[in-house]
Swiss-Prot record:
InterPro entries recorded: 4pyrrol_Mease, 4pyrrol_Methylase_sf, 4pyrrole_Mease_sub1, 4pyrrole_Mease_sub2, Dphthn_synthase
Keyword Translocase: no
Role noted for this protein: S-adenosyl-L-methionine-dependent methyltransferase that catalyzes the trimethylation of the amino group of the modified target histidine residue in translation elongation factor 2 (EF-2), to form an intermediate called diphthine. The three successive methylation reactions represent the second step of diphthamide biosynthesis.
UniProt pathway: Protein modification; peptidyl-diphthamide biosynthesis
Species name: Methanothrix thermoacetophila (strain DSM 6194 / JCM 14653 / NBRC 101360 / PT) (Methanosaeta thermophila)
Superkingdom of the organism of origin: Archaea
Family of the protein in this entry: Belongs to the diphthine synthase family.
UniProt entry tagged with the keyword S-adenosyl-L-methionine: yes
Lineage summary: Archaea, Methanobacteriati, Methanobacteriota, Stenosarchaea group, Methanomicrobia
Protein name listed in UniProt: Diphthine synthase
Protein keywords: Methyltransferase, S-adenosyl-L-methionine, Transferase
GO biological process, any: methylation
Catalytic activity entry: 2-[(3S)-amino-3-carboxypropyl]-L-histidyl-[translation elongation factor 2] + 3 S-adenosyl-L-methionine = diphthine-[translation elongation factor 2] + 3 S-adenosyl-L-homocysteine + 3 H(+)
Record text on subunit structure and interactions: Homodimer.
Length: 265
């Protein structure tokens, strides 16, 4: 059987008791951290707490034809991933391939940023629209390309009074920060003639699940220069606010009263 074990948000202690029991009893334990990272720990600390040797898998060993998957035909194999396993389409694809191979699968869910953000900010979870990722700019034929997809997702959600959760890009050991994401969104907006976009309310969250988590609300322009500290970072662009959401942003994220006054439903 193949067990997908979610490790939670930040460090080795975020695993569930059920997940820990499965890891300790499995015949083999693997991990992949290219889809999501636990920034507050290391593979050595995971091995120490869990009492198991853990083999790290590369992207090709997950998305290609993984030889290790064959072991799950007649043994219990645990795959450790950050957050919740099935948030990533990569893991869903792997699970479906395993089922097609006749391998039984089981998912041990973990806390993830999508479910944590409403609790961190006080924004109601049912009022979030489509999420998006803010990617790093890339170069095509010598031209710098900035994706307009996250900006378009935000605008579409705002038209429907919905909040937008923005994931920030990860490339190897390079982590996008809130400041850069805010700057990229403003750049795309200005290029579209939407110069008022920088005045939108935004919420930055750094190191969710850690003891030194940073949560700050302000205009997008203000977040562009605010120091959030080390990664991982995510950002929320809220739509119109229920009065309880507005109160929560004041108390939990330091949102200025004058900024919130135009956002309440």
């Amino acid at each position: 059987m193949l067990f997908f074990v979610g490790l939670g948000l930040y460090d080795e202690r975020d695993i569930s008791v059920k997940g820990l029991e499965i890891v300790r009893c499995a015949d083999a334990v693997y991990a992949e951290f290219y889809t999501s990272r636990l920034m507050g720990t290391s593979i050595e600390r995971l091995e120490q707490l869990y009492g198991r040797e853990i083999r790290m898998l590369s992207r090709s060993e997950i998305e290609g034809e993984p030889e290790w998957l064959e072991h799950a035909r007649d043994r219990n194999v645990a795959l450790l991933v950050g957050g919740d396993p099935m948030i990533s389409t990569t893991h869903l694809d792997l699970r479906l391939r395993a089922i097609e191979m006749g391998i039984d699968t089981r998912v041990i869910h973990g806390s993830n940023i999508a479910s944590a953000v409403p609790g961190i900010t006080g924004l109601q979870n049912y009022r979030f629209g489509r999420s998006a990722t803010v990617p790093f700019p890339h170069i095509v034929r010598g031209k710098r390309i900035v994706s307009s997809t996250p900006y378009n997702a935000v605008k579409d959600n705002l038209r429907r009074d919905l909040h937008t959760l923005l994931y920030l890009d990860i490339q190897d050991e390079r982590f996008m920060c809130i400041n850069e994401a805010a700057a990229l969104l403003i750049e795309v907006a200005n290029g579209s003639g939407d110069e008022d976009f920088a005045s939108n309310l935004a919420v930055g969250i750094a190191r969710a699940g850690s003891e030194d988590m940073c949560v700050r609300a302000g205009t997008l322009l203000e977040l562009k220069t605010y120091s959030f500290g080390p990664p991982l970072h995510v950002m929320v662009i809220p739509g119109r606010l229920h009065f309880m959401e507005a109160k929560a942003l004041r108390m939990l994220a330091g949102a200025p009263e004058e900024l919130l006054s135009g956002y309440e439903l």
